[in-house]
């Protein structure tokens, strides 16, 4: 396994873009991101444990209940949470994107991050979606920038690894610098891979990994409403699909863990007001004496 460039566009068949659509007042700040797979991918996700859940999360959870997705759209600057028409706006966002991309609305992950309780106007999103499509390319950096809120740096990484002698790639982007507390918190993480793995095993891998990565970091003790970690696997690497535990699954887990640990550390290092990052390594004794 080795670290490579490309972020979420490192894996075959994935493109990304990021634009300023007008949600944020600063015109130099991108505020709308898109990640797109040329074919429908298997998908897995984990979500915030906050009892109050943002409208985009509710919509996404419903969309990928079948373990499938083809695109991710995320806006920054407004969380679309605690709004009377929040679900309607999130669904409208996916409908507009689906129409432009020629895919199913149900195959779209919708995410938002930003101010809670402020109405989200669909107009800037509607005007920004065509630009997102036009800008699709190897632009993981644009997407990483567009999902930032109080972050000071974009966060992206990619790795290459082998499954059964076939080269596979995996990449991820993340946002988060405040309201970071165990059991998710204000974090959005989007991971892509061209490795062929069933949606069931993908979910198993993600759920297992999260317990030892994102659910272990804390910055300020606050848990947010919108946040999720999502993985899309389109299988374009051409390896034999991972459908059970074994050596191939273990190699996939190693790659996933490399991505998540790196992103976790970048989030912690970028914490609001953070000057020092602490890592604690515990070694349990092999034998206990009474």
Per-range role (PLM):
Residues 1-47:
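N-terminal amphipathic/basic leader segments beginning at the initiator methionine
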Residues 35-67:
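Active-site-flanking structural segment that lines cofactor/substrate pockets
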Residues 52-63, 88-100, 203-216, 255-264:
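Short, well-ordered amphipathic alpha-helical segments that serve as non-catalytic structural scaffolds
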Residues 70-77, 107-113, 227-233, 273-279:
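Glycine- and acidic-rich phosphate- and metal-coordinating loops
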Residues 100-214, 224:
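Glycine-rich, mobile lid/loop segments that gate access to catalytic sites or pores
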Residues 193, 233-236:
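Channel- or pocket-lining gating/hinge segments that regulate access to a cavity or pore
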Residues 215-218, 236-268:
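Glycine- and Gly-Pro-enriched alpha-helical subdomains that act as flexible
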Residues 280-286:
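Conserved small/polar residues in nucleotide/adenosyl-binding loops
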């Amino acid at each position: 396994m080795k670290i490579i460039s490309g972020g979420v566009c490192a894996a075959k068949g994935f493109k990304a873009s990021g634009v300023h659509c007008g949600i944020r007042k600063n015109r130099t700040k991108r505020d709308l991101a898109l990640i797109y797979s040329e074919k429908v991918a298997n998908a897995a996700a984990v979500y915030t444990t906050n009892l109050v859940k943002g409208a985009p999360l509710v919509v996404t959870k419903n969309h990928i209940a079948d373990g499938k997705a083809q695109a991710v759209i995320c806006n920054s600057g407004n969380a679309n949470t605690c709004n009377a028409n929040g679900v309607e706006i999130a669904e409208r966002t996916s409908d507009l994107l689906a129409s432009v991309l020629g895919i199913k609305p149900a195959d779209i992950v919708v995410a938002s991050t930003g101010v809670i309780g402020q109405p989200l106007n669909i107009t800037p999103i509607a005007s920004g979606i065509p630009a997102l499509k036009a800008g699709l390319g190897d632009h993981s950096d644009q997407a990483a920038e567009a999902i930032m809120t109080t972050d000071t740096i974009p966060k992206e990484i990619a790795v290459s690894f082998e499954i059964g002698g076939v080269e596979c790639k995996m990449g991820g982007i993340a946002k988060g610098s405040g309201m970071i507390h165990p059991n998710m918190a204000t974090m959005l993480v989007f991971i892509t891979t061209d490795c062929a793995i069933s949606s069931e095993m993908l979910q198993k891998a993600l759920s297992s990994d999260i317990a030892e990565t994102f659910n272990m970091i804390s910055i300020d003790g606050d848990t947010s409403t919108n946040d999720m970690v999502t993985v899309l696997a389109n299988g374009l690497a051409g390896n034999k699909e991972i459908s059970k535990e074994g050596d191939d699954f273990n190699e996939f887990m190693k790659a996933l863990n490399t991505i998540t640990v790196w992103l976790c550390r970048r989030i912690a290092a970028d914490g609001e007001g953070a000057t020092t990052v602490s890592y604690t390594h515990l070694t349990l004794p092999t034998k206990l004496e009474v």
